[in-house]
Amino acid sequence: MRDYEGNGVDIDNNGASPYSQHISRDHENERDSSRSRDKERDKGRDKDRDRDRNRDRDRDRDRVKERDKDRHRDRDGEKDRDRHHRDRHRDRSDRRERERTRDRDEDDLHRSRDYDRRRDNDKDREDRRRHRPSSRGRSEHRSKSRSRSPSKSKRISGFDMAPPTTALLPGATDAAGQVPGTNPAIPGLFSNMFPLASSQFGALPMMPVQAMTQQATRHARRVYVGGLPPTANEQSVATFFSHVMYAIGGNTAGPGDAVVNVYINHEKKFAFVEMRSVEEASNAMALDGVIFEGGPVKVRRPSDYNPSLAATLGPSQPSPNLNLAAVGSTPGSSGGLEGPDRIFVGGLPYYFTESQIRELLESFGQLRGFDLVKDRETGNSKGYAFCVYQDVSVTDIACAALNGIKMGDKTLTVRRANQGTTQPNPEQESVLLHAQQQIALQRFMLQPGALATKVLCLTEVVTVDELNDDDDYQDILEDMRTECEKFGALVNVVIPRPNPNGVPTPGLGKVFLEYADVDGSSKARQGLNGRKFGGNQVVAVFYPENKFSEGDYEA
């Protein structure tokens, strides 16, 4: 119902005008709009908060991930550091291992070379023993450079390692081949051979003198054993003869083995057996024909045996008290070529056969023993022989009748083999004089402060048998050069050789080494003196330079 109409204003029943109602509606709309805006604003803020929360969550998550990554990186870094340390340690270990391996390789190389050399040495040494008759058993094979067939590798040094220092002291009296704890091989030898007053030289060092004893008596201490079976070797021969000598009571130098060394030639089936003493070697002569490995063997004196000189060294006949029955032998079963009635027959034509020579000799009576000396290599006669008659009373008759007889282009020389033993013959006098000079020389050289020279003299190195063969001689020269130039500049090596006509050679058996300076010779003397060469103990002394330059090798 409208209350007012005159002024155009409508008023409702409640008394409100339309205008006010319109305003009121606007206000309500505005409030609604404001509320809507507030709601929208709140929604926006909520969205922002949610977005912020989500962002914070994402940030936290990223931060956590980043921390985890950092942690992993740190862990990886530690692993890397550990790996780096391990790598460095491994590198160091590898480097050390490589160095050790290189050192081991070098050592192995040296050892391998040494082993190869030793193996070749042993092989060559065995070949030499098998194929050559000389005392050290050198091989017949020679190097191609010498145009000899079959070929042979280079000779191996005969030197062994240096002996203990006690072997070089004056009190060390055990000589090469002498069993420790036993008496010397030849008691009283030097009082008979070298009548030198003790005041003349004073107390001599024993080692060089005993070494000289071994050299001086070697020819009388060796026996030749022929007819060996193919299976024989050095060890079996040494064991057999040591056992047999003990069984017959032939050991006179004390307890232990009588055999010192054995040099065997497998091709020619013979050996040289070296005994401890002259007396034991003489006892071994009673073993001629003894059964060895199923067959008899011949036991003889070697070709270098000197009966005249041996007579001054010890018994030359076997002991009559030997128990030969212990080995199945009987006294007198040997060839009977020993004793004062032994005859030397020289100047025989080389083409004479053994039967022809026997026929000539037996024209004076039956022979108890006969031995035609033959070349070990070729088997040909050397032009001389030895014999003993059953009736010794015909000995001088045969000598007088046969001596001086012309046989073809030769003239016979027939005499007692031991003729002149009461007085030293020229050869014996030479040996004794040489021994006296050697003692005097060594006494001077071994005195404290003795004058050193550039020349060194070695004894106890080579034997006469080894110097006769040209190729053996060249081998020894090479051997000496190879070994001795290790100590200094080696200028010259001189090794005197035997004269083919039998005239004594000054310095025979010695080796002279000339160095560029005294330092080299002094080192060589220190390194070589007392060492073993082929089983012999080497004696090294300085030698006067003026004598060496003049070719005087006798002092």
Curated annotation (Swiss-Prot):
Residues annotated as region Disordered? Answer: 1-165
SUPFAM superfamilies in alphabetical order: RNA-binding domain, RBD
Q: Name one GO molecular function term.
A: RNA binding
**Gene3D superfamilies xrefs:** 3.30.70.330
Q: Name one Pfam family in it.
A: RRM_1
CDD domains registered for this protein in UniProt: RRM1_U2AF65 (cd12230), RRM2_U2AF65 (cd12231), RRM3_U2AF65 (cd12232)
Where is composition skewed (Basic and acidic residues) in this entry?
23-81, 90-127
Per UniProt, residues of the RRM domain are 221-304, 341-419, 460-546
Broad class of where this protein is predominantly found: nucleus
Composition bias of kind Basic residues appears in: 143-155
GO annotation (BP), single: mRNA processing
Keywords from UniProt, A to Z, are: mRNA processing, mRNA splicing, Nucleus, Repeat, RNA-binding
Annotated localization: Nucleus
Task: Return the PROSITE patterns for the record.
Answer: RRM
Gene Ontology CC annotations of this record: nucleus
The tissues where this chain's protein is expressed are given as:
Expressed in stems, leaves and apical buds.
Instruction: Give the family from UniProt.
Output: Belongs to the splicing factor SR family.
Q: What information about domains appears in the record's comments?
A: N-terminal RS domain has a very strong bias in favor of D over S.
Function of this protein? Answer: Necessary for the splicing of pre-mRNA. Binds to the U -enriched regions of plant introns.
Protein's recorded name: Splicing factor U2af large subunit A
Species of origin reads Nicotiana plumbaginifolia
Q: What is the lineage of its organism?
A: Eukaryota, Viridiplantae, Streptophyta, Embryophyta, Tracheophyta
Gene from which the chain derives: U2AF65A
